[in-house]
């Protein structure tokens, strides 16, 4: 799960048209490393999710590293909470875990910003 950092500030200072452009550009950034069976979903507001159809924790780790290594190419800073769906687990539980990881990462980045690339 991804959350754009300070997105409200973009809308408030640069206007909603610019905010809409940032959302489209960010979705394109998220799609960059994905294969044909992998999708980007906008969850609402400034939250996005990358959905991997085939559960592969190795692929999840590769994508997480790609996004962190290419963060400077994103149109805006973001926070990332990665997790995978466990068989037998509800989708709601998976989303809640991703959301918890996302907000822990967001708090960490605000305390200790990532170095510029």
Describe every region a protein language model picked out.
Residues 6, 16, 70, 84-85, ...:
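Histidine (H) residue identity feature
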Residues 61-64, 80-117:
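Catalytic-core segments of nucleotide cyclases and related cyclic-nucleotide turnover enzymes
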């Amino acid at each position: 799960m991804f959350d754009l950092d300070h997105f409200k500030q973009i809308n408030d200072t640069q206007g909603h048209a610019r905010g809409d452009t940032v959302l489209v550009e960010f979705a394109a950034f998220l799609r960059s490393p994905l294969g044909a069976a992998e999708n980007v979903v906008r969850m609402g507001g400034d939250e996005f999710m990358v959905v991997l159809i085939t559960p592969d924790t190795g692929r999840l780790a590769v994508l997480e590293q790609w996004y962190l290594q290419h963060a400077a190419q994103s149109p805006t800073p973001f926070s990332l909470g990665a997790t995978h769906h466990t068989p037998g687990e509800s989708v709601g539980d998976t989303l809640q875990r991703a959301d918890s990881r996302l907000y822990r990462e967001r708090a960490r980045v605000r305390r200790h910003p990532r170095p510029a690339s």
